[in-house]
């Protein structure tokens, strides 16, 4: 079977993490390709994909209205002649013309994703029961639930018992720095509140990057908790999987989530 996965970009996120695993597993038995439409991708992530997967980069400039990338995408799909086209953004359905006689799937990776371009011929996949319920409530359509998976054997396990005598309690949060969704500001304010109450043996590491980093750093200064909050920046999955065990607690103060893949990774590392 020939399977083509289509994405606009390939950066840091739960969808990309999941897609890497899917590509690697499917390529063991099927002919698999990945098409990245925009000129937005991280090479170190692409290096984690099995070389058997063919990767096509169309290098469209994000936000471009040029018709040439659209034509290039459809010409490529025509040449690949896949049995299955699997898209990971509903907006891609607006520009893909090659559909007849092929399985067309859309994985909905979060809550509140617009689905006006997903016709009745598109089979919807939800990453959680919450996403499935959201789809049904907004559109009346039924989706198939396939929960995100994680490679349990690659995540090192925490074995020591928590003890905070004479040392800090280490807390980790792994996600894009986006206060509107991921809620890092809530955790910073909680640390500041505990400091006001005389509890200062708490250290928080934020792993990730994003548009809210300047705002979060300013918040850290305003609350005078700079000695307790660390911004570690972007770390690859190998680093995260080998270092989660060093923490005492994972905190994910998201305001909403479709699934929360990093929470599952924390549980796999035996973190409370």
Locate each region found by the language model:
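Short His-centered aromatic/hydrophobic patch
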Residues: 65-69, 86-93, 108
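Aromatic "clamp/platform" in nucleotide-sugar-dependent glycosyltransferases that forms part
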Residues: 255
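Nucleotide-activated donor-binding/catalytic signature segment of Leloir-type glycosyltransferases, i.e.
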Residues: 217-235
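Short glycine/serine-rich donor-binding loops of glycosyltransferases
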Residues: 260-263
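N-terminal strand-loop element at the rim of the active site
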Residues: 5-68, 210-213
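Carbohydrate-associated surface elements
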Residues: 130, 149
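A conserved mid-protein helix/loop that constitutes part of the nucleotide-sugar donor-binding site
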Residues: 13-21, 169, 178-195, 204, ...
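Short alpha-helical donor nucleotide-sugar binding micro-motif in glycosyltransferases
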Residues: 77, 234-235, 242-247
């Amino acid at each position: 079977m020939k399977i083509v996965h289509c994405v606009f970009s390939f950066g840091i996120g739960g969808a990309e993490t999941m897609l890497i695993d899917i590509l690697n597993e499917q390529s063991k038995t099927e002919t698999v390709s990945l098409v990245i439409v925009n000129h937005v991708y991280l090479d170190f992530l692409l290096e984690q994909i099995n070389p058997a997967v063919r990767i096509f980069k169309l290098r469209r400039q994000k936000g471009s209205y040029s018709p040439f990338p659209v034509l290039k995408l459809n010409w490529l799909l025509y040449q690949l002649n896949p049995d299955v086209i699997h898209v990971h953004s509903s907006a891609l359905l607006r520009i893909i013309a090659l559909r007849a006689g092929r399985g067309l799937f859309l994985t909905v990776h979060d809550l509140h994703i617009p689905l006006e371009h997903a016709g009745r011929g598109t089979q919807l996949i939800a990453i959680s029961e919450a996403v499935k319920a959201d789809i049904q409530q907004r559109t009346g359509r039924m989706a198939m639930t396939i929960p995100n998976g994680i490679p349990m054997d690659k995540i090192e396990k925490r074995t020591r018992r928590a003890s905070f005598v004479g040392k800090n309690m280490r807390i980790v949060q792994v996600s894009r720095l986006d206060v509107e969704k991921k809620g890092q500001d809530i955790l910073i304010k909680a640390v500041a509140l505990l400091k006001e109450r005389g509890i200062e043996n708490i250290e928080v590491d934020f792993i990730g990057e994003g548009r809210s980093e300047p705002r979060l750093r300013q918040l850290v200064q305003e609350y005078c908790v700079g000695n307790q909050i660390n911004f570690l920046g972007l770390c690859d999955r190998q680093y995260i999987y080998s270092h989660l065990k060093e923490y005492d607690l994972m905190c994910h103060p998201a305001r909403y989530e479709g699934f929360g893949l990093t929470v599952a990774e924390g549980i796999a590392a035996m973190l409370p």
